[in-house]
Amino acid sequence: IWLPIQFDEQGVPFIEWTDEVNLSAQSEWKQVWSDEFNTDGLPDTTVWNYDNGFARNEEAQWYQKGNAYCKDGKLIIEARKEKGRKNPWYEAGSNDWRKKREFIEYTSSCITTAGKKEFLYGRFEVRAKIPVSGGAWPAIWALGSGMEWPSCGEIDIMEYYRIKGEPHILANAAWGTDWQWNAKWNSKAIPFTHFTDKDPAWADKFHIWRMDWDETAIKIYLDDELLNEIPLSETVNGTIGKGTNPFRMPQYLLLNLALGGINGGEIDDKGILMRYEIDYVRVYQK
């Protein structure tokens, strides 16, 4: 057995475990894909798709391609306030929330790897700086393909929004039940003060969200702090999903900045230009 022996300034030997153990653990993982966002302009269209329009959760923003762009080695997703822009889906008298809005008040972007990059198990790392203004709902997440939500499975590596007016960071997973579009959740909501009490400048900095996912569990970390551990033994779909386990099937990635809706809350839109910055997305497997 090789021991990590080092010597102090007096030449006395000692064993320093921490760095070596971390190095050994990291060396088990091999990077299989990444996007470093190093080319200015639109994100790589061979990897990323774009949501278009009003998408989900009665959110306020209209998703469009132009609000996501790469600059200076980062992906920028911007939420912008619009003025007098007509909703092309508008139908007077409609009960559909997507169609009954006459105007588009806000725009943003959601990019996904659906149909282009899917992964089964691995370590997923995203280094990002998130907006924390009122109404902001940034996310790093994953979905399965081939089944309706939630039987396809959803993993929320990161969500930020307000719960009863107080900001939280969330780490979740959802899967199917016996009722269509009804999910079972394993969710952890950590008060934002848990982070800002330690570092008042937390929101001004980049942080690393990580998911370690194998055939036994999903573990979600923020700056190496474990936020949630979800055993795959509990994530079995109900009858709608035919008893399958969505987290033993491939998932694709999504990055988005939503506003308002059922979770985002009241939007602080004074001169709004919210910016969600992603330094990189990296995927490792053993």
List the predicted regions and their residue ranges.
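Beta-propeller fold recognition
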Residues: 1-28
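GH16 jelly-roll
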Residues: 21-286
